[in-house]
Structure formats: structure tokens, C-alpha cells
Design a protein with these regions (language model features):
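Active-site nucleophile/metal-coordination loop of metallo-enzymes that catalyze phosphate/sulfate
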Residues: 1-5, 13-183, 193, 197, ...
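Short, hydrophobic/glycine-enriched beta-strand segments
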Residues: 4-10, 247-250
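Short glycine-rich anion-binding loops that position phosphate/pyrophosphate groups of nucleotides
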Residues: 13, 253-254
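Long, well-ordered, tryptophan-enriched scaffold segments
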Residues: 104, 154-241, 245, 254-256, ...
Length: 289
């Protein structure tokens, strides 16, 4: 006799002994407790090479869904990017080389935009640093980094660690031009008022300002803001101007798509009024469409 089988995927439900920051162990879940007590529980590996991620990298919902749906291990795009960087191939990409040539001719700035985080869900630190190094190796003299802080896939006040790591590895000529929480620039729910606040800091160099990244973090924490919700601040430079180039560094598309569309599309439905800078190039680690 055949019986129906229901596969229910509960994002965020996992097994970890430590109770700190662990909603699962602290929650009241009588049904799951009964299943566990009756021995109706087994475990799947959901991180690292078991799901096509780098060894030791935690998994996430998108990765889990992809592997479950495929019924096999699927190498993630982050792994492909990592290999490209390790093999020294990133600086050989034609689009990046063309952008470098144009910037050398007009004295423009390359703007790198990415989530500065060790979470590994939307970006990787080695990708951010590798991109800056590849640009510097091509002779790009002005590299402005627009840092988006996490606090969603990482601890809520851990940005200092990742910002310090980024700053210590940036090549000569690179600097952090703006800083703000992912809540704004990485919105994916058509809440354009959030994106507009990030736009003001990143593109127009307007709104809240700070002297350096650490001062902004300290001020945000004193105001009760956590990393995800840090008010976008302009730090250095004149924003994104005509003749500049932009390179988005997140490898996951869903939370880059809106900001990228605002920067490249005139008739994006629902988007706020703005003047788009005339860029010589707008690049991405992946296709964000």
C-alpha cells in the first residue's frame, strides 16, 4: 500500500549543543521533542563540502534547497569564484581589464560594494580582498569600498572584526568610502525608501557622515543599532560620479538586485527619483538579473 510522503523544510532548524544564541534549544517545541524522544530523528550534514561549499563554511537556506532539490552535491558559485581568485584569473577578465583601462584614461574611481562579513551566505572576505587586489594589480589607483555590515548571518555586533580584517588587507589607494547596515542597500522586498538611504551615502555622499569606519560602528552601538540596521554613513570621497566604475562583490543575487537596478536602469518600477551617474562599467561577481 502506497502512502503519501510530505517533505517539510524548516529553515533555521538545526542541531547544536550550545544554548547561547540558539533559538532551537530555547524554544517550546513539544512535537519535535516527542519525535526526538521516540527516536524518530536523524541528521544530515548541511555545511562545507557536503553541500558544495568550502570546507568549514556554514550552509544556508538557498544552498540547502538547491542540494535537496538536485538530489546531489552541487558546487556553489562561491567555490567557483574562490578558485578563480586563487588561480590568479580574476585580473585577467576582459570586462575588468577594460574598466581599468578606461579609469586610467579618465582618472575615475572604482567603487566596490559588498557585504563585509564572515557569514559566507552572500559574500566572502577572501572575495572582497581578492577583488581589491585584482583591481590594484591592474593599475587602478583609486578604489572606494562601500562596506555593508551584516548582523543577520553573523552575530549582531561583530562588524568590527570584519571591518578591521578588510582594512588591514586593502591595497594602496583603496579606502572605505561608506558604511551602513545591509537592511538598507540589500533590501529585496521593494521597500525603496530603505535603498534610497543607502543611495544617499554611497552614490551621493550625503546624509550621515563619519570620520572612519570604527567611529561609525562605535556611534551606532552607542545608539542601540546592531550591524544589520546601522544607518548608512558617508566617510570619504565624493560618491559615485560620472566616469566611475562599480563592481558588486556579493555572489548571491537576491539582495543586490534592487540596488544594482537603481544604479543601471532608468525605468525601474517603484524606484525613487534619482540621477544615475554615467558609469563606464558596472560589474558583478554573478548575474544579478
Amino acid at each position: 500500500m502506497t502512502r503519501p510522503l510530505l517533505l517539510v523544510i524548516l529553515d533555521g532548524l538545526g542541531e547544536r549543543e550550545a544554548a547561547d544564541d540558539n533559538a532551537v534549544t530555547q524554544a517550546y517545541m513539544p512535537t519535535f521533542d516527542r519525535l526526538r524522544n521516540e527516536g524518530l530523528v536523524s541528521f544530515l550534514k548541511t555545511s562545507g563540502d557536503a553541500v558544495g561549499l568550502p570546507d568549514g563554511q556554514m550552509g544556508n537556506s538557498e544552498v540547502g534547497h538547491l542540494n535537496l532539490g538536485a538530489g546531489r552535491v552541487v558546487d556553489q558559485v562561491s567555490v567557483q569564484i574562490t578558485k578563480t581568485i586563487q588561480q590568479g584569473e580574476l585580473s585577467k577578465h576582459k570586462l575588468l581589464r577594460d574598466a581599468a583601462s578606461s579609469l586610467a584614461g579618465n582618472g575615475g574611481t572604482l567603487h566596490l560594494i559588498g557585504l563585509v562579513s564572515g557569514g559566507g551566505v552572500h559574500s566572502r572576505m577572501d572575495h572582497l580582498i581578492g577583488a581589491a587586489e585584482a583591481a590594484a594589480n591592474l593599475g587602478i589607483e583609486r578604489i572606494a569600498f562601500h562596506a555593508l555590515t551584516d548582523g543577520r548571518d553573523t552575530a549582531p555586533k561583530s562588524a568590527t572584526l570584519w571591518i578591521q580584517q578588510l582594512e588591514s588587507c586593502l591595497p594602496k589607494g583603496a579606502y572605505i568610502a561608506s558604511l551602513g547596515g545591509r537592511f538598507f542597500a540589500m533590501d529585496r522586498d521593494q521597500r525603496w525608501e530603505r535603498v534610497e538611504k543607502a543611495w544617499a551615502a554611497i552614490v551621493e555622499a550625503k546624509g550621515a557622515s563619519g570620520t572612519n569606519a570604527q567611529d561609525v560602528l562605535d556611534h551606532a552601538y552607542n545608539q542601540g543599532e546592531t550591524d544589520e540596521f546601522i544607518t548608512p554613513h558617508h566617510l570619504e570621497g565624493a560618491g559615485i560620479r560620472d566616469g566611475d566604475a562599480v563592481w558588486f562583490l556579493n555572489f548571491r543575487a537576491d539582495r543586490v538586485r534592487q540596488f544594482a537596478a537603481a544604479l543601471t536602469q532608468d525605468n525601474e518600477p517603484g524606484c525613487f527619483d534619482r540621477r544615475r551617474p554615467n558609469l563606464i562599467a558596472c560589474l558583478g561577481m554573478v548575474d544579478y538579473r
